[in-house]
Amino acid sequence: MITGMDARRTWLVTGAAGFIGSHLVEQLLLAGQRVVGVDNFSTGLRENLDLVRGAVSAERGSLFSFFEQDIRDRDGISELVSRSKPDVILHQAALGSVPRSIEDPLSSHESNVDGFINMLDAARKVGVQRVVYASSSSVYGDIGDGAKVEDRLGAALSPYAATKRIGEIYAQVYGRTYGLETVGLRYFNVFGPRQDPNGPYAAVIPRWLAAMAKKNPTAIYGDGSGSRDFCYITNVVQANLLAASVPSSSAAIHSVVNIGCGATTTLMQLQQLLRRHIARVVGCQVDQIPEPALEPIRQGDVPHSLADISFARESLGYNPTHSVEQGIAELVQFELAKTA
């Protein structure tokens, strides 16, 4: 058991109906924690909350309270945090997607910067012990190839990246100015069950999986040599709980920490992994699943992304349990079992 999870605390999870947030809510309830969930359903799904309730006992489910609330509503969020009096906030709410931010930068700023400051200030006023918040590997921008280290940043390549970097700065300022303990987690390409495959801003793995399962064509932006550090949701849940529970003396406090696997997979390798595991589960030949089409690289995309997770290991005790292949195998089994 992670240190600090043996005693019951109150946790506020923003973005609770989202992909990552719903997994955090589920794990906290399974651990017997009291959880307050917040979401405005701009990208989160009610179905995810239903899945959470179905995964825990009625007794554990009674520890969960949910509020439909927009983090951009300063007064509403302040009142909710004041009423809930959480010990810890796990802040996952955001408008994700680089392409979305390029098309609509103001909405990204309002959710990812203004909304986050609202959470920080509400936490400060109530005396929340710690805020763990989601940042992104996109903040590394054009730093170049090689493993990304927390203190070496390039120029931001999208409004989304800018919003996440601004959030990191505000969190650190709230720490220095008000003593609010914060830990930022720079996620590297998280994937897993409950990730929405639909819409123009869907992440690559759920989008490809949904298409390949129906033997529909897929597309790679670029020549397939671009690479990412894909990180399974189980690893990300572990990182959040560790960040919320490490002692105040940890070097992670008031810092940002890379959360990935420390290994890269090219987009073409990812295609092959998905095709192989889908073929195994549905009982078809790999060559019955169409090869991807190659399309021009999208604006704001970086060619390669790899996390140096040394600091996460040292400061949090983070140890990813699922490799990309293990995560893909588990994800494919889960998603295709739903349609069997």
Over which residues does each language-model region extend?
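Residue-level signature of the cytosolic catalytic core of signaling kinases
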Residues: Q69, D73, P197-Y201, A263, ...
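Hydrophobic alpha-helix immediately C-terminal to the catalytic Tyr-X-X-X-Lys motif of short-chain
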Residues: I166, Y170, Y174, V204, ...
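Short glycine/proline- and charge-enriched loop/turn segments
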Residues: G146-A155, A203, A293-P296, I309
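Short beta-strand->alpha-helix junction loop in the catalytic core
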Residues: G192-R194
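C-terminal substrate-binding subdomain of Rossmann-fold SDR/epimerase-dehydratase oxidoreductases
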Residues: T10, M212-A340
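The catalytic Tyr-centered alpha-helix of NAD(P)H-dependent dehydrogenases
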Residues: R152, A156-T163, Y187, P197, ...
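N-terminal Rossmann-like NAD(P)+-binding domain of SDR-like oxidoreductases, especially those catalyzing
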Residues: M1-V190, A244, E335, A340
